[in-house]
Amino acid sequence: MYPLAFAKEGEEVIVKKIDAGCGAMQRLVSMGINIGSKLKVIRNQNGPVIISTKGSNIAIGRGLAMKIMVEDAEYGGENEKL
């Protein structure tokens, strides 16, 4: 497992753990990001991490992206549609 902030552009990952407070968790859930969600990293350079999930692109601040622990979808995920 590693933080979403360390994922490479184009990589598909599965959310395994979220180390965020209640407010941040609610915000992530409202955006469709949960434990088990499959994400594709669109952009990960300076500034927010841009991900795609369930047909939507979402910007996540680097601080929050450090609290979202992920795993490579090829090795440890479900076959959920992006």
From Swiss-Prot:
The keyword Transcription regulation is annotated on this UniProt entry: no
Keyword Transport among record annotations: yes
Domain of life assignment: Archaea
GO biological process: iron ion transport
Pfam family, one: FeoA
Disulfide bonds listed in the record: none
Cleaved signal peptide residues: none
GO molecular function terms noted in the UniProt entry: transition metal ion binding
Keywords (A to Z) from UniProt: Ion transport, Iron, Iron transport, Transport
SUPFAM superfamilies linked: C-terminal domain of transcriptional repressors
Purpose of the protein: Might be involved in Fe(2+) ion uptake.
Family statement drawn from the similarity comment of this UniProt entry: Belongs to the FeoA family.
Name of the featured protein: Putative Fe(2+) transport protein A
Organism the protein comes from: Methanocaldococcus jannaschii (strain ATCC 43067 / DSM 2661 / JAL-1 / JCM 10045 / NBRC 100440) (Methanococcus jannaschii)
Higher taxonomy: Archaea, Methanobacteriati, Methanobacteriota, Methanomada group, Methanococci
